[in-house]
Swiss-Prot record:
One Pfam family recorded for the sequence: DeoC
Name of the featured protein: Deoxyribose-phosphate aldolase
Originating gene: deoC
EC number(s) from the headed UniProt entry: 4.1.2.4
Molecular function GO terms recorded: deoxyribose-phosphate aldolase activity
């Protein structure tokens, strides 16, 4: 099993009815497989942080999620609380309506949240399902101008998740100035491998264990 596979996974659990025992399992699996991070809703940051102590697994949470329709001030406040409670990484939803109006406030919003993050990783979700190809390119550049560390495809709560076409456009637009995270609807090992081979730096999925098991089976089959 290639080490890179598990180390680019954000194992994600963001559903509204998540219970503590599910967070327990998420964190235990992340420790077992040494996923790069787990991503949980803000209400579970403190809880998950305690479980992850000493595991080497990073803790990610979301801001302005899932619509992005909160103000810059609110996103900054959410980020401050998340970091105070133990978040290592922030996945923030871009204000898509303001972006479509070509408002410079979108760049300033990203910069403001990144300033709070400091050395912590900021990923900006652009929700590619709601953008055309030119808008995807522009959104990548907005994230670069905003000093984000990653541009991320999707929340997983819109019409669709990541596509290989999205990733191709984002890679071309990025000029290697920003990393790319694919997320939303990544359910199988083949999808995972497609995104991995397309050059993404991180993959978010709520099917991380299933994908790892499938990858192990594929590897075993290849070595027969």
């Amino acid at each position: 099993m290639k080490l890179e596979y598990n180390r680019i996974i954000d194992s994600t659990l963001l559903k509204a009815d998540t219970l503590p025992h599910e967070i327990d399992a998420l964190c235990a699996d992340a420790h077992k497989y040494q996923f790069y991070a787990v991503c949980v809703n803000p209400s579970y940051v403190r809880y998950a942080k305690n479980i992850l102590k000493g595991t080497g697994v990073k803790l990610c949470t979301v801001v302005g999620f899932p619509l992005g329709q909160t103000t810059q001030r609110q996103k900054v406040y959410e980020t401050k609380i998340a970091i105070k409670e133990g978040a290592d990484e922030i996945d923030m939803v871009m204000n898509i309506a303001e972006f479509k109006k070509r408002c410079a406030c979108v760049i300033s919003e990203i910069r403001a949240v990144k300033k709070v993050c400091g050395k912590r990783t900021l990923k900006v979700i652009i929700e590619t399902a709601l953008l055309n190809q030119d808008e995807i390119r522009d959104a990548v550049n907005v994230c670069i101008d905003g000093n984000a560390d990653f541009v991320k495809t999707s929340t997983g709560f819109s019409m669709r998740g990541a596509s290989l076409e999205d990733i191709t456009i984002m890679r071309e637009a990025s000029g290697n100035l920003i990393k790319i995270k694919a997320s939303g609807g990544v359910q199988t090992a083949q999808q995972f491998l497609d995104f991995f081979n397309a050059g993404v730096s991180r993959i978010g999925t709520s099917n991380a264990v299933k994908i790892m098991e499938e990858l192990h089976k594929l590897e075993s089959h290849e070595h027969r």
